[in-house]
């Protein structure tokens, strides 16, 4: 159905001996960015993490900009769509969206990275965009409209992951029940005559949120607009 090209997920690329690969450098940089923020990713810090001299990294990335581009390229390398499968454009587009969401869930630094570099200088981003435009023109949109839709989908994925329900990022797991309790009490204490729906929302904080249900629902929501416009004839809105 959908080609997912394996990358070094979950920081699985290891540096052994003299074999310092481009993928290993990008993967370790991603680990730093995900755990400490993009500002923590410097050539000097990365070299220390990898146990090499800064000069060793210049073999793969000449400067910090190239390193950031390499990180984006590495993260998006699995975003592909195969037109030869014979599946509908709707299913193939959903696979693209779900894959992008999955990458962003695994690498929370990706949205910041995407806004920090010229994405069109990376092979994987251009390939993913080209594949998506092909799907959207197949759906009936013009190339220009397809680009608008693709931008909407990318920003929608960023918003979905950034707004996922639950406790604040980085909160220790043993503190999560208390955080949810306090949030529930806060909402329950709002004036019911003025904010009845907010008070009702409080009940949703009794248990851990169902993340898989949340992401499936949001993917449906995101794609429903595209499918609806395609069915109505996207190009008629020019």
List PLM regions with ranges.
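Amphipathic alpha-helical segments used for helix-helix packing
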Residues: 70-72, 101-121, 131, 162-169, ...
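Hydrophobic alpha-helical connector segments
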Residues: 81-127, 143-146, 150-153
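Short, basic, alpha-helical segments at the C-terminal edge of helix-turn-helix-like DNA-binding modules
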Residues: 74-78
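Helix-turn-helix
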Residues: 24, 28-66, 70
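N-terminal intrinsically disordered/low-complexity leader segments
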Residues: 1-20, 195-205, 234-238
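Amphipathic C-terminal alpha-helical segment
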Residues: 155-170, 188-209, 224-232
